[in-house]
Amino acid sequence: LVDNSVSSGAQIKTGGKTPAGTGAFYPATVLTVKSDNPILKQEIFGPVAPIVITSSDQEAIELANATEFGLISYVYSADLKRAIKVAESLESGMVAINKGVISDPAAPFGGFKQSGLGREGGFAGIEEFLETKYIGVEI
């Protein structure tokens, strides 16, 4: 994944090589990439963060939404109001603002598009196991 991205023009800022020896894990890797890099069309499960510099929030939103995946998105900003506006525009099942870990047993977990249908956890996750009944009464 990283090698393919680098061969398509990405630059490794940190990580990118597995340390020698046994028991080594792939290190956290940060890449700077152009908006046409194939890594942006992948659903990445691992410590790899491709970073794209954009000129506007709208450009960043369009680029993020251009993928067929949508499990989680991350927004970092000193302007919380702006970050929430961006988060609301992202086609993603979960959005973390200014944090890396978003898991919470009380919150729904799941994605949009090819990243899943339905939710686990929270009220949304238990709802599909409930029998909903409507009773209409006229008195």
Predicted regions located by residue number:
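Short secondary-structure junctions
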Residues: G9-K17
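Conserved C-terminal structural/oligomerization subdomain of aldehyde/semialdehyde dehydrogenase
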Residues: T18, F25-I139
